């Protein structure tokens, strides 16, 4: 069949040859077809069979039953193994579908990372792309939001592939019926309270759904090209305007910032905030643009917060500093055999053989800032966003910009830090 041949051409050119692959399976027709295609491809090429992962969001009474169906049917289709990942919901407010989507990807990526599976396949297709475009158009999205989905993306160290992107829902359903596959019809797909259902029905009601869907996807592709061009010039602006400091903050030179086209300057501010906060989701546009417009008023005072960051004017620069109250302390046991990540901004190597439990936490305003830190010519708020090694509220070691721990006289503990903010930036602006 043509779909199967085209699918094989897609995956034959992919990087996951000879590597374990996981497939996200909701139980819907698209993900069942993806699992069937991938299993057949692996068998044909004598490769490791895919692992099926399904997320139980627990949002409907039948959720557990559907998850059990996926596990059972995945085995029947020939999956190597199958697992149910449960979403532990807490205080859900606002857009529940968006929160469920974020939770789903988080659970899938974490499972893959914890089980040394580098490649995750998801079943987005051409109709998904068109519906997403219309949804975002209604919300007033910009170039990035209206851009086509990527065949390959990256999340928390995991490569995510979408091998069905060029296939329509009708082609996928035709394949499923031909092979007599079983799947679940999600009732929410027909629930008119969801905007996606509205746009799905709108496309179906058009004179020629396939042509309209194709043209919407083509427009999304044009937007993707435009987004890549904008990102290219954003990267150049970072080289000229931004200093990523070893002390874990970002400094934007205002003299250069004011010379940039507004779209590039806005992106530079956005990705600086995301890199410090280590978030893959963008902050609310209305909040971002309010801060941006304030920065553009050259005589205005800028001192505000967004996404767990402090954005403030300091001399001739704009500083993006981590908000200390949003930093979570972590507990580690000494000695540590390898570096540990702290606040997604630092890789910390803690040296010491006391065999005790310590915490890595920022300084509190009530704790003394050592003189050697004051010698650095930076905003004092930076000091309270740095990692220190503490026990019983006593500081055992301070970090040093030169990556050598400054120790107190009575404890033999070293805190060697390496900033990971540049890596955060690279992952954000390297499309």
From Swiss-Prot:
It catalyses: cytidine(34) in tRNA(Ile2) + L-lysine + ATP = lysidine(34) in tRNA(Ile2) + AMP + diphosphate + H(+). The keyword Ligase applies. Transmembrane segments: none annotated. Gene3D superfamilies: HUPs. ATP binds at residues 26-31. Its EC number is 6.3.4.19. GO terms for molecular function: ATP binding; tRNA(Ile)-lysidine synthase activity. GO terms for cellular component: cytoplasm. Ligates lysine onto the cytidine present at position 34 of the AUA codon-specific tRNA(Ile) that contains the anticodon CAU, in an ATP-dependent manner. Cytidine is converted to lysidine, thus changing the amino acid specificity of the tRNA from methionine to isoleucine. The N-terminal region contains the highly conserved SGGXDS motif, predicted to be a P-loop motif involved in ATP binding. This is tRNA(Ile)-lysidine synthase. The gene is tilS.
